[in-house]
Amino acid sequence: VYERIRQVMTDCPGEPIILLVPEPATYRVERELAEFMPEKGFTTVRVVGFGRLGYQVYQSIGSKGAGQSSLSSFGRSMLLRLVMKRKQKELGLLEQATKRPEFSSVLQQLFSEFRAFRVGPADLERGAESVKNNILQKKLRELAICMSAYEEELSRHGERDIDPIMEIVEALPQSPLMENSHVFIDGFHWFTPTHYELIYTLFDLAKEAVITIDLPMAPKTLNLARRGEHLFSRPLEIYDTLVA
């Protein structure tokens, strides 16, 4: 990847380069890339994780992105507590849990994970219909009730319960950062469905896009029947998703 980036800097001077890596690795990669360059530095490369990418995209279009919400995280938590109180009579298994102050934060985090995997109230209902375990059925249906009511209440306040990654996806086409950009994605071992949406959008908008996947050999030569047990099962999943 570093070699290709150096080549782009030579062949296309001044054109923006985005190197997307896991958030904890950004500073290490910046240092390694700087040391790799002949001049021991670079000016046109943005080494970012998903969070920093979002910040720079919003900054480029004069938007605060996720921070534009008039409701803080605490405000959303309070709103969720209000929703659960209103729906208490419809809840059986979760009724006692709703009385605990910390449960709204737990539920908020759960809804955040649902959004990352593109799971909504209707998906929870379908999941409840497909399982045979009665307790799991009830839990899924009660979660669907809470999530649906929460989304409706947010809508009444002019808010959306949207995944932060999907906000970046919506903002990217407006960003001048993508003009004649070269995008490189490196160091990831798995992605959520919303991450894939962002990757596809980056690939559509970029002049050039490259993603690296750590695999021991050509994917087609691996034992397909035992892929799930393979040490590289997650990178293989990325490969299968991207080439599908």
Where are these regions (language model features)?
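Basic/charged alpha-beta structural segments of nucleotide/phosphate-handling enzymes
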Residues: V1, P24-R28, A34-L177
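Conserved SF1/SF2 helicase motif Ia
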Residues: I5-I17
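Short, surface-exposed basic-aromatic patches at helix termini and helix-loop junctions that form
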Residues: T10, A34-K40, Y200-L205
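Short glycine-/polar-rich loops that comprise or flank the Walker A/P-loop
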Residues: P13-P16, K40-V45, E179-N180, A206-A209
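Conserved RecA-like ASCE P-loop NTPase motor core of nucleic-acid helicases/translocases
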Residues: G14-T26, I211
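Short catalytic/ligand-binding loop motif for oxyanion handling, primarily in non-cytosolic enzymes
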Residues: T26-V29, G54-Q56, T192-P193, A218-T221
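Short regulatory helix/loop adjacent to the ATP-binding pocket of P-loop NTPases
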Residues: E32-F36, L222-A225
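Conserved helicase NTPase motor core
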Residues: S73, D123-L242
